[in-house]
């Protein structure tokens, strides 16, 4: 009986506790209900505002086609007039074109080797293949970008594009799987980029620097006998001649330009880890290192880096850029000197 009484008391306490808990939960809910309402309302307003912002952004993006005012970088914007000649070498269009060129020339070189499966290709098609990159258009580049949106791989998109071009030629179906044979993406990138730099230097940069040097030499000759008060530490010093001061920069530029031209422009080309593993396993009878050296030198005009990992060592590119930096430093010095000559009214 005592046990039964204790049980009834426990049930009574438990029921009271449950009732009290329910009341507390109810009170808490009604206390936070207005806050929850305000929070949900704020969330809706924020969501609506975000949608308006996104709609506005989308509207602006549609309107803001690339031009000198909408370009993100002043290189392609404000200074487009000064840099547009470099677009043929350093734009994404140019990079894609150079990749196509390297892939085509590599395939042709495999045919010239020849690989056993490529013996049936008539050399008369080589010029047709080269016309793929010689006549490369923005539409071709856009086709590669469309393929890339599916593959999510830029170099693989170039390979698929070339397979489509082979299909258009007819009679090439048995050979198109040898496009990009044994290569890794960096074999294409680390040849395309150095090739673009080489051609930009040869066709744009060197002619401009040489034109500057020639103009300075002309001035140095014209002003050879013009006396000028030299200064050191901003104070009058011994006399000099204006022509000689100009020749200082001719001398500096010529030597730095020679050092730049002495830098080898090198490329990495050797498979996934730089060892031609896939090439050797597939065709051990060929000297693939000699093949790579010949291909890079004769078809691209570059020098192959002998020992690499999957990527280029980049040391020689660094040397090129450092040499260009020194040339820039010389030109900055020249500009500052002439600015000072003007401020001292040596020039008017």
Each language-model region and where it sits:
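Serine residues within intrinsically disordered or low-complexity segments
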Residues: 1, 12, 21, 40-42, ...
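Ala/Thr-enriched low-complexity intrinsically disordered regions
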Residues: 2-5, 15-17, 28, 47
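Basic polycationic patches enriched in arginine
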Residues: 8-9, 26, 61-63
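Short, positively charged low-complexity motifs
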Residues: 9, 38, 47-54
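Positively charged N-terminal leader segments that act as targeting/secretion signals
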Residues: 18-29, 35-36, 43, 51
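A helix-coil-helix interface module used to build multimeric assemblies
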Residues: 63-276, 283, 287-295
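Glycine-rich anion/phosphate-binding loop at the beta-strand->alpha-helix junction
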Residues: 256, 310-348
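Active-site-adjacent "gating/activation" loops or surface patches in catalytic cores
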Residues: 289-310, 314
